[in-house]
Amino acid sequence: MVTIEPLAFEQLNIGDKWTSADRTVATADLQSFADLTGDHDPLHTDSEFAASGPFGRPVAHGLLGLSLLAGLSSNAPAVLTAALVDIRGWSFSKPVFVGDIVRAVTEIIDLKPKGRRHGEVHWYRQLINQKGEKVQDGILITLVSRRVPLPNIKTLQSPTIGSEVANLEVIGQ
Protein backbone atom coordinates (compact mmCIF):
# COMPACT_ATOMS: atom_id res chain seq x y z
CA MET A 1 0.00 0.00 0.00
CA VAL A 2 1.26 3.46 -0.93
CA THR A 3 1.06 6.18 1.70
CA ILE A 4 -0.06 9.52 0.30
CA GLU A 5 0.90 12.65 2.22
CA PRO A 6 -2.24 14.83 2.29
CA LEU A 7 -1.94 18.30 0.83
CA ALA A 8 -2.43 21.37 3.00
CA PHE A 9 -4.29 24.52 1.94
CA GLU A 10 -1.13 26.41 0.99
CA GLN A 11 -0.09 23.58 -1.37
CA LEU A 12 -3.21 23.99 -3.52
CA ASN A 13 -3.60 26.26 -6.56
CA ILE A 14 -6.53 27.45 -8.63
CA GLY A 15 -6.60 25.32 -11.78
CA ASP A 16 -5.10 22.20 -10.15
CA LYS A 17 -6.92 19.15 -11.56
CA TRP A 18 -7.10 15.46 -10.63
CA THR A 19 -8.84 12.32 -11.88
CA SER A 20 -9.67 9.48 -9.50
CA ALA A 21 -9.42 5.76 -9.97
CA ASP A 22 -12.40 4.00 -11.59
CA ARG A 23 -15.15 2.25 -9.65
CA THR A 24 -17.79 -0.16 -10.93
CA VAL A 25 -21.32 0.33 -9.56
CA ALA A 26 -22.71 -2.98 -8.28
CA THR A 27 -26.21 -4.19 -7.41
CA ALA A 28 -24.99 -4.56 -3.83
CA ASP A 29 -24.15 -0.82 -3.80
CA LEU A 30 -27.78 0.09 -4.55
CA GLN A 31 -29.08 -2.33 -1.92
CA SER A 32 -26.58 -1.17 0.72
CA PHE A 33 -27.42 2.48 0.02
CA ALA A 34 -31.15 1.69 0.25
CA ASP A 35 -30.57 -0.05 3.59
CA LEU A 36 -28.42 2.80 4.89
CA THR A 37 -30.82 5.60 3.90
CA GLY A 38 -34.16 3.80 4.11
CA ASP A 39 -34.89 4.72 0.46
CA HIS A 40 -36.15 1.38 -0.86
CA ASP A 41 -37.93 2.87 -3.87
CA PRO A 42 -38.41 -0.05 -6.30
CA LEU A 43 -36.96 2.11 -9.10
CA HIS A 44 -33.60 1.41 -7.40
CA THR A 45 -34.07 -2.02 -5.87
CA ASP A 46 -36.61 -4.04 -7.88
CA SER A 47 -35.50 -5.15 -11.37
CA GLU A 48 -38.99 -6.23 -12.42
CA PHE A 49 -40.60 -2.95 -11.34
CA ALA A 50 -37.76 -0.84 -12.78
CA ALA A 51 -38.07 -2.61 -16.16
CA SER A 52 -41.39 -0.81 -16.67
CA GLY A 53 -39.97 2.52 -15.51
CA PRO A 54 -38.39 5.38 -17.45
CA PHE A 55 -34.94 3.75 -17.67
CA GLY A 56 -35.99 0.13 -18.29
CA ARG A 57 -33.79 -1.12 -15.46
CA PRO A 58 -32.81 -0.17 -11.90
CA VAL A 59 -31.11 3.19 -11.58
CA ALA A 60 -28.76 4.20 -8.77
CA HIS A 61 -30.01 6.69 -6.21
CA GLY A 62 -28.85 10.20 -7.17
CA LEU A 63 -27.27 10.65 -3.76
CA LEU A 64 -25.43 7.34 -4.18
CA GLY A 65 -23.67 8.91 -7.16
CA LEU A 66 -22.77 11.95 -5.07
CA SER A 67 -21.55 9.66 -2.28
CA LEU A 68 -19.43 7.64 -4.70
CA LEU A 69 -17.95 10.87 -6.02
CA ALA A 70 -17.10 11.96 -2.46
CA GLY A 71 -15.28 8.70 -1.84
CA LEU A 72 -13.50 8.63 -5.19
CA SER A 73 -12.30 12.21 -4.82
CA SER A 74 -11.08 11.74 -1.24
CA ASN A 75 -7.71 10.59 -2.61
CA ALA A 76 -7.72 12.60 -5.83
CA PRO A 77 -6.32 14.67 -4.25
CA ALA A 78 -5.78 13.65 -0.63
CA VAL A 79 -6.00 16.86 1.39
CA LEU A 80 -6.18 17.84 5.06
CA THR A 81 -9.97 18.25 4.96
CA ALA A 82 -11.46 19.80 8.08
CA ALA A 83 -15.11 20.05 6.96
CA LEU A 84 -17.53 20.06 4.06
CA VAL A 85 -19.32 23.42 4.29
CA ASP A 86 -21.46 23.72 1.16
CA ILE A 87 -22.65 22.10 -2.06
CA ARG A 88 -23.67 24.48 -4.83
CA GLY A 89 -25.41 23.95 -8.14
CA TRP A 90 -25.35 20.17 -8.01
CA SER A 91 -26.76 18.63 -11.21
CA PHE A 92 -27.87 15.07 -11.87
CA SER A 93 -27.47 15.05 -15.67
CA LYS A 94 -27.69 11.36 -16.54
CA PRO A 95 -28.64 8.19 -14.68
CA VAL A 96 -26.08 5.85 -13.15
CA PHE A 97 -26.76 2.13 -13.65
CA VAL A 98 -25.46 -1.11 -12.21
CA GLY A 99 -22.35 -2.02 -14.20
CA ASP A 100 -21.42 1.59 -14.94
CA ILE A 101 -17.78 2.46 -14.33
CA VAL A 102 -17.45 5.91 -12.80
CA ARG A 103 -14.61 8.22 -11.85
CA ALA A 104 -14.33 11.66 -10.27
CA VAL A 105 -12.72 14.62 -12.00
CA THR A 106 -11.84 17.49 -9.67
CA GLU A 107 -10.62 21.02 -10.33
CA ILE A 108 -9.90 23.82 -7.86
CA ILE A 109 -11.81 26.92 -8.96
CA ASP A 110 -11.29 29.18 -5.93
CA LEU A 111 -9.20 29.44 -2.76
CA LYS A 112 -10.03 31.71 0.17
CA PRO A 113 -7.90 31.97 3.33
CA LYS A 114 -10.09 31.61 6.44
CA GLY A 115 -7.96 32.54 9.41
CA ARG A 116 -4.73 31.03 10.64
CA ARG A 117 -5.78 27.37 10.68
CA HIS A 118 -7.84 26.76 7.52
CA GLY A 119 -8.61 27.83 4.01
CA GLU A 120 -11.79 27.45 2.00
CA VAL A 121 -11.43 25.45 -1.21
CA HIS A 122 -14.04 25.56 -3.99
CA TRP A 123 -13.88 22.29 -5.94
CA TYR A 124 -15.66 21.78 -9.26
CA ARG A 125 -16.35 18.05 -9.26
CA GLN A 126 -17.75 15.81 -11.96
CA LEU A 127 -18.81 12.18 -11.89
CA ILE A 128 -17.95 10.71 -15.30
CA ASN A 129 -19.13 7.32 -16.62
CA GLN A 130 -17.33 4.79 -18.82
CA LYS A 131 -18.63 6.55 -21.96
CA GLY A 132 -16.98 9.80 -20.90
CA GLU A 133 -20.38 11.32 -20.11
CA LYS A 134 -20.82 13.72 -17.22
CA VAL A 135 -23.54 12.16 -15.05
CA GLN A 136 -23.30 14.56 -12.08
CA ASP A 137 -21.46 17.78 -11.36
CA GLY A 138 -21.34 20.81 -9.13
CA ILE A 139 -19.28 22.75 -6.64
CA LEU A 140 -18.28 21.40 -3.24
CA ILE A 141 -16.76 23.78 -0.73
CA THR A 142 -14.53 22.45 2.03
CA LEU A 143 -12.30 23.81 4.74
CA VAL A 144 -8.76 22.50 4.33
CA SER A 145 -6.23 22.76 7.14
CA ARG A 146 -3.08 24.77 6.77
CA ARG A 147 0.27 23.32 7.76
CA VAL A 148 0.70 25.58 10.75
CA PRO A 149 4.37 25.69 11.76
CA LEU A 150 5.06 24.43 15.24
CA PRO A 151 5.42 27.24 17.75
CA ASN A 152 8.77 27.96 19.33
CA ILE A 153 8.79 25.76 22.45
CA LYS A 154 11.18 26.21 25.35
CA THR A 155 11.49 23.85 28.30
CA LEU A 156 11.86 25.49 31.69
CA GLN A 157 13.18 23.78 34.79
CA SER A 158 11.58 24.80 38.07
CA PRO A 159 13.57 24.11 41.25
CA THR A 160 10.51 24.79 43.45
CA ILE A 161 7.99 22.43 41.86
CA GLY A 162 7.97 18.66 42.32
CA SER A 163 9.53 16.48 39.64
CA GLU A 164 6.11 15.40 38.29
CA VAL A 165 5.55 18.88 36.81
CA ALA A 166 9.08 20.22 36.71
CA ASN A 167 9.17 20.57 32.91
CA LEU A 168 6.94 23.36 31.62
CA GLU A 169 6.41 24.20 27.99
CA VAL A 170 6.12 27.84 27.04
CA ILE A 171 4.55 28.40 23.66
CA GLY A 172 5.24 31.40 21.47
CA GLN A 173 8.15 32.96 23.31
Where do the model's predicted regions map?
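Hot-dog-fold acyl-thioester-processing enzymes
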Residues: 2-86, 147-173
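Conserved interaction-surface patches within small, structured recognition/assembly domains
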Residues: 88-90
